[in-house]
Amino acid sequence: MANPRLEKVTAENIDAAIALKVRPDQERFVAPVVKSLAEAYVHSETAWPRLIFDGEELVGFVMAFFEIRFNPEDPDDRPRSGLWRLNIADGRQGRGYGRFAVEAVTEEIRRRGGQKRVTVTWAEGEGGPEEFYLRLGFRRTGELSGDQVVGELDLKDT
């Protein structure tokens, strides 16, 4: 990992973004980039999709969410911000790009203000991302969002 950076999705890089694939054994844990881009379009007020480049090479995709409620019908549900999607390209994992992306999302949440925690959800299963998120300091909250585990990272711990 030389000098990773985040870039907006543009007309010039959208085809490369859509072509980005995770390892085949991870496809059941994360939606493809094309679905994320469709969700970002539909939820343009709360979604923050970015591409992860190292030099000129596209190595991943990350999408954050800002100020959403998981259970809007629950009056005690608070707005949350966090990591919606993380796709690191097959062959580029284990090089620090995922950590970089999580740190970048954390910094963006901190910059926007109003949050004490970063939220993430993940699908459970062998080979899934739980260990990665726990290593970064996320802790299970005991909640589920659909069929996914909810984890949180206190911003004061970062």
Indicate residue ranges for each PLM-predicted region.
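Conserved beta-strand-loop-alpha-helix junction that forms the acyl-donor binding cleft
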Residues: 118-130, 146-148
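Conserved acetyl-CoA-binding loop-helix of GNAT-fold acetyltransferases
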Residues: 94-107, 131, 135
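Acetyl-CoA-dependent GNAT
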Residues: 3-4, 8-91, 104, 108-112, ...
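Short C-terminal beta-strand
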Residues: 152-154
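Conserved acetyl-CoA-binding loop of GNAT-fold acetyltransferases
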Residues: 133-143
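Short acidic/polar active-site loop segments enriched in Thr and Asp
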Residues: 115-116, 139
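Active-site acidic-Proline motif in GNAT/NAT acetyltransferases
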Residues: 89-91, 95, 124-125
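Short, charged/polar, Gly/Pro-enriched secondary-structure boundary elements
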Residues: 156-158
